[in-house]
A protein has these predicted regions:
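Conserved N-terminal/central alpha/beta ligand/cofactor-binding core
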Residues: 6-7, 24-128, 143, 155-175, ...
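Terminal amphipathic helices with adjacent charged low-complexity linkers/tails
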Residues: 201-216, 220, 280-281, 285-295, ...
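Conserved FAD/dinucleotide-binding core of flavoprotein oxidoreductases
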Residues: 226-270, 292-320
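Beta1/beta-strand and adjacent pyrophosphate-binding region of the FAD-binding site
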Residues: 5-18
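Amphipathic alpha-helical blocks
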Residues: 268-280
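Conserved beta-strand-loop-beta-strand element in the redox core of flavoprotein oxidoreductases
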Residues: 130-146, 152
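Short, Lys/Arg-enriched N-terminal segments with co-localized hydrophobic residues
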Residues: 1-3
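Short hydrophobic core segments
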Residues: 11-13, 146-157
Length: 320
């Protein structure tokens, strides 16, 4: 067996949405590229709700597509519902949004990346940047492999020193049941970079078999055929599925208020500021205390999945 020499033009660390686009773009522009991921079965994993686009975000996906990116194509191929938001306004305000099959989304990304010339994929964890003469020239991995590169792109998402909060319980991790990555943050600090911690949250998922859909309002997808990509004509491959609408009530709010003392957002555990337009359910009932209900969307996670995502109900409250 010939010794494998790890010399690349570009190494991309992390195979989420940004990393996949960066690696794909670099390879297609002719650079010998390596994409490093902790888990090759989680490439392009949709960490929160299995949806792409929406107001403002949908325009960004189309801009990525116009510049030759792959996200729009992957989304179209994995869509289980497509809707144009803001239809009551003029066309300039319309925003495309797609519900995706979480498993299919990963599979479509893998198909694209594994058939892209100049692109290799390596499963490992980067723990250190190799720097010589003030210049990044490679990475060192948890397995002890050193890889050379002319440039390194960090697209680490939530994994650098990631910390998960379940009420007062704290667990190191980048996502549920996935480990954090240590070493890079500490090295960046030593090199003089300022680092900070960002916060995001996600709701518990619910089992489809436990839902009484007769009590919910069905939200169908659009019947006219829209898509994200201008570059690829895709016929819907998957069964189109409905989302469902419901609301919290005062009884829900009372239960949530009783647990606020155990919420990391309100007991001092979490100091970071969360995303502006995606507040947790705790934040909603505190900030908008005058509201007697909040809208929730139950979204399917895939054609063959029993999991439903509760959009509008992200929380760091304990499981109780």
């Amino acid at each position: 067996i010939d010794y494998m020499e790890f010399k690349y033009d570009i190494i991309v660390v992390g195979a989420g949405h940004a990393g996949c686009e960066a690696a794909s773009a670099a390879a297609r522009m002719g650079s010998k590229t390596l994409l490093i991921t902790m888990d090759m079965n989680k490439i392009g994993q949709m960490s929160c709700n299995p949806a792409v686009g929406g107001i403002a975000k949908g325009q960004i996906v189309r801009e990525i597509d116009a510049m030759g990116g792959q996200m729009g194509i992957v989304t179209d191929r994995s869509a289980i519902q497509f809707r144009i938001l803001n239809r009551s306004k003029g066309p300039a305000m319309w925003s495309p949004r797609s519900q995706s099959d979480r498993k299919c989304f990963i599979e479509e990304w893998v198909k694209i990346l594994t058939t892209t010339p100049n692109l290799d994929i390596w499963q490992d964890t980067v723990i250190e940047l190799i720097i010589k003469g003030g210049q990044v020239c490679g990475v060192k991995t948890l397995l002890g492999v050193e890889m050379q590169a002319k440039a390194v792109i960090l697209t680490n998402g939530t994994f650098l020193n990631g910390l998960l909060h379940f009420g007062k319980t704290q667990i190191e991790g980048g996502r549920i049941s996935e480990p954090s990555s240590f070493g890079i943050t500490e090295q960046l600090r030593q090199l003089g970079f300022a680092t900070d911690r960002m916060k995001t949250g996600t709701p518990a998922r619910v089992d489809k078999r436990s839902i009484d859909f007769s009590q919910l309002t069905e939200q169908l997808g659009d019947e006219d055929n829209h898509q994200f990509s201008y570059l690829d004509t895709v016929q819907r491959q998957l069964k189109q599925m409905s989302c469902w609408i419901t609301y919290t009530n005062e009884q829900t709010h009372e239960v949530l208020r009783s647990g606020l003392a155990d919420s990391p957002l309100y007991n001092g555990q979490i100091q970071s500021i969360g995303p502006r337009y995606c507040p947790s359910i705790e934040t909603k009932i505190v900030t908008f205390a005058d509201k007697d209900m909040h809208q929730l969307f139950l979204e399917p996670e895939g054609v063959d999945s029993n999991e439903y995502y509760i959009n509008g109900f992200s929380s760091s409250l304990p499981w109780q």
